């Protein structure tokens, strides 16, 4: 089909919503609770559904100060998500209920729109529980504005990070970003310089005991480059890219070959698994790394994330 009028082709599946246009196809799964497929120019960018992330691999300072024990609930909340609500809006039509089978039979294969918005609400597996929401807003050229809202609640333990984790099917060959030089954290930004930077591969800082690393604060734009897919008949090995841009404010990110849990599970650098995928975390709030004296003193309070306050951030996929 030739998409010449900048309209979205909306496909109301039995348990999914398809949003197609020129050179892009997106599938949102009601069953899995999120964006299941993100294809751009025929290349798949998702290995699994993006989810809220609340855990980062603990640092020497975290372990020395006991932060890992205080925040342990967030590890479970990071590993397991519970989607409790899905809301859909196409153009100005606000769906009172999801258009799943058999309700979707009223729609044809020729449904078009200028915009679509779908939100997924998740309940954290913590005590007390709270909610986080991821909202996808797609415009007529296929740009996706992604917004995450974390709803603060009294009585929750301190947070390591608030973000969205996107796991990609294969390892990136590198990434380019516009922001601050080097690895930066809220309490480690003073020496950084603004500019445009290129990183080869997916480097991991070789600590004796693997830990949190690779965060980049206050980023305006990020482009991730890959050359391989999981499609056995796709043997082009030509570079293809996905870009993430700031929305209202700069974002923070890490782009590593491991999840926080994989880093957490290894007691030595050589115990990390073979590099297979790309783990992108876009973070709205990041806890500082501390290290004031002998890696035992807590992070200064200015660099904590208050779990009782609401947090919101956005970025644009294109």
From Swiss-Prot:
**GO annotation, cellular component aspect:** beta-galactosidase complex
State the InterPro entries in the record. Answer: B-gal_small/dom_5, Bact_Beta-galactosidase, Gal_mutarotase_sf_dom, GH-type_carb-bd
Please provide the Gene Ontology terms (biological process) for this protein.
Answer: lactose catabolic process
Inducing or repressing factors: By lactose. Part of an operon consisting of lacL, lacM, and galE.
Record EC number: 3.2.1.23
Q: Which Pfam families match?
A: Bgal_small_N
Q: How does it assemble?
A: Heterodimer of a large (LacL) and a small subunit (LacM).
Q: Which family does it belong to?
A: Belongs to the bacterial beta-galactosidase small subunit family.
Q: What protein name is recorded for this chain?
A: Beta-galactosidase small subunit
What reactions does this protein catalyze? Hydrolysis of terminal non-reducing beta-D-galactose residues in beta-D-galactosides
Q: What EC class does the entry list?
A: hydrolase
Is Hydrolase one of the keywords?
A: yes
Record-level Gene Ontology MF annotations = beta-galactosidase activity; carbohydrate binding
Which parts of the chain span the membrane according to its record? Answer: none
The organism encoding this protein is Lactobacillus helveticus (Lactobacillus suntoryeus)
What the protein does? Component of a beta-galactosidase.
Arranged from A to Z, the UniProt key words for this protein are: Glycosidase, Hydrolase
